[in-house]
């Protein structure tokens, strides 16, 4: 997915489930002034994950505080919710969001990030140049108090991994919290 970010004006959707795939497909077809791409998993998707609310262009999947903002990309939404539960069990307030559209970067997401101590992206792309890197760059302002971290499957050449492998590779709640 990181290579798509260099295409000027591109719109890239990463649906989290079948429901958002249908919705984002309709939105992609309506884009007439730029290229659009929908990135979906090759495996079957899990159950639909309903949003609590939509803030601008961002779906909020869970909200219990502003210590950590977990930004889940695509089908990793359920894993983000599981990680949030683990953090909440340790007394850490978490907001889990799905940006829906990876590119262009959502101003709404950048504003959400500014109100959290730590921002963690959960994605299955490469270490460099992915969505997490783009979000960290967008959030890097002189007045920002948020720290950004990424959780990815692997660093190196483009390969594929199962969702279970991505979860095993993700940072533990303890290591994530220490990063703050």
Say what each PLM segment does.
Residues 1-28:
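Conserved thiamine diphosphate
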Residues 30-180:
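Thiamine diphosphate
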């Amino acid at each position: 997915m990181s290579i798509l970010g260099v295409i000027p004006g591109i719109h890239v959707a990463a649906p989290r489930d079948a429901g958002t795939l249908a919705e984002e497909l309709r939105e992609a077809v309506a884009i007439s002034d730029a290229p659009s791409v929908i990135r979906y998993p090759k495996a079957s998707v899990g159950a639909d994950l309903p949003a609590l609310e939509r803030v601008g262009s961002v779906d909020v999947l869970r909200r219990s505080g502003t210590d950590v903002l977990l930004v889940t990309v695509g089908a990793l939404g359920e894993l983000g919710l599981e990680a949030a539960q683990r953090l909440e069990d340790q007394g850490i307030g978490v907001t889990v969001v799905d940006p829906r559209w990876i590119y262009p970067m959502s101003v709404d997401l950048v504003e959400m990030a500014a109100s959290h101590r730590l921002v963690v992206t959960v994605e299955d792309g490469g270490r460099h140049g992915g969505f997490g890197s783009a979000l960290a760059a967008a959030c890097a302002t002189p007045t920002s108090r948020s720290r950004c971290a990424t959780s990815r499957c692997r660093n190196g050449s483009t390969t594929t991994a199962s969702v279970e492998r991505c979860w095993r590779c993700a940072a533990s709640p303890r290591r994530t919290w220490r990063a703050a």
